[in-house]
Amino acid sequence: MQIKIKEGIIKENILFIFLAALLMAAAVLQLTIPLTKFFSFEYSVVNSILITFFISIITIQNLHKKNPESYRDFNTGTASNLFLFFIIPLIIAFINTVLKNQCPFYHGLPYYFTIVFPAIFVGRGIGIFVFCAIRRFRNIGLIFVYLLILTIPLIEFYLNPQVYFYNPIFSFFPGNIYDESIRVDVTLITYRLINLIFFESIAVIYFLSKKIEFRRGIIVIYTLITSLIFIILSPYLGFSTNMERIKRKLPVSEETANIRFHYGNERTKKEMSYSTFEAEYYYHELSEYYKTEPDKKIDAFVFKDSGEKRDIFGAGNADVAKPWMNQIYLSEQTLNRTLKHEMSHVFTSKFGKYVFEVADKINPVLIEGIATASEGFYDDYPLHYLAFQAYKNGYLTELPELFSGLNFFAKASSSSYLTSGSFVKFLVDKYGIEKFKLLYRDIDFMKHYGKDIATLNKEYIEFISIQDFPSNKAVANYYFGRKGLIQKNCPRYFSAKTEEIFELIAKRNYLDAKEIISELELKNTSWALTYAMIECNQGLGEIRSCLRYIENKETTYKGTAYEEILAIRKADMLFLDDQTDKAMNILVNILSTSSVHRVYFLAKTRIILSEKMVIKEYIMGNEETRAHIFKKIFLQTSNISLIPAIQDKINYQDKKNDWILEVVLKGTVKNNYEKYALIKLSELLARQGNYGKAKQILDKAKKPEGECIFNELLKSVELKLLRLSEGKTQLQNE
């Protein structure tokens, strides 16, 4: 008798048992996949998607077979099942955390409760709606409704100026550009509370009436009308962004023949004018490069900082283009570096594919490769120069590997962008842009080039290998010795804790910051943590302790992008410990490696300041103190290597600073790095509207003549200055 009862219970709950087993298997599978293997945001999102769907199925079955009479009966009959659905992924995550000792379990709890707990009620609401709206084939109808809700973000992504989404099934998506910093904030909590209340209200309303037909009609009408009202109010609640919202935030516009810029009130008229001039110049360059141009004006939205951009658009840490909308989204701090790259994405829409007008199979190698190739430079170095350094020092990725799966994202972004850009530039230069356009729409190398990717890869490597550049291990390490996205350990947790650390450092709460750093370093190696620990030790005056810490880290960062930066910080500590000779030896050694430009200037600046006996004041000083020191020493030495350290702190529109330019013009350019410093100063002057002085500085950069890795950059800037100095009217009428 008992066996029969148990068999009956199992038979009655066979669907639940099957779905629970499926949920358990999915949770275990997630632990093998990058990002979802950590108990964090992604893990919660995936389980929210699954639990919502499974509970919808169970709800439909419960209403169909058991037909509960009241809201109380409905809850009583499903409470244990709902609880088990909620707890299964949580238990598996807990066991995994204990066994692998990765992210602290408490880190994932806010994500899980905020995202997954409301999913229970969302699933019930969807199930009731489908039960009421569809009479036959309800499971098929459920799949349709479920997919419809999931596709709403695609509609928003396509039509609205945003890349983030709020959705009742998966709660929140920060954008198609990965951002490690996602917090459970007031907006997300509010959104999930609204989800919970709305979808559970469907259940309450369903049981208010005893008449089945009335129930069905009122549920359908209530759900559709409430959903429509929510969609209309969504931009005002901060859950979506329409054009009205973005223009309220960026009310100032500047327009030319081909570009329309949208700014906040912070930018000056001169700054806006330069950006539009520069954009017009890039527009003409890209038109010549692609042999085509967009059908309508490009709209460029420029946010004051990454925080504002994240709140309004999403993707705070990356600039983005929407080619199908002829729109680009930039931050004030990155505008001058990324403007041409993002504009290039808009140009590729002319030969792009699908509704989003991008590369075939949405291939990132082609999408980012052609935009990078059209610039010709990466961080002011020629693309092939950096690819050559990768080849010579064992970093260059084989193209078949880069085109495969998620390998583009497995590498550090600098490595993937550089390799893609250099390869695509090789293809365009050798075979022409028209063949590449065909490839962009249809990734079939044999069809369009008569060669497969392996053969083209061999051609490309042969081309790179014979480039006439000196090999430089330091440059290769700097750009290619970094971790990729899916190689990082517990990225959400470490990002949140790192932000907390730097907030504590800003408040000079060094002891609490050190305690967190020490805890994190037991599980992860991160340059941000290393840098923060050095700052804490310096702030506490624990110089000897800091030196020991740095020496222990030297092996860790050997051959990486941070090796020389760590050496510079070691030199700083040696200066503070009165070990000047040792510090100078480190800095001189860095100069001898012909490192990247910014590392060279960091080292050279310290050597100059040490010789002038102000190095300690510089290391311990704040930004204002450092700016004063730089001006003073520059006046004494006229050393052009100091220019990069002061140029962002100087307003050259102020006549009081004319003396700096006069000193520069009287000085002597001693090496290629100083040539580079003058090129960047020239660009800055042009940005501030002083084209005359910009040209004088650039003319100065031409001497001495001879081979220089920055000669291509110099020619590019010279041509741009020539065009910009001709004025806005001529640029528009060309």
State what each model feature region is.
Residues 60, 71-77, 81, 286, ...:
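Active-site recognition of the HExxH zinc-binding catalytic motif
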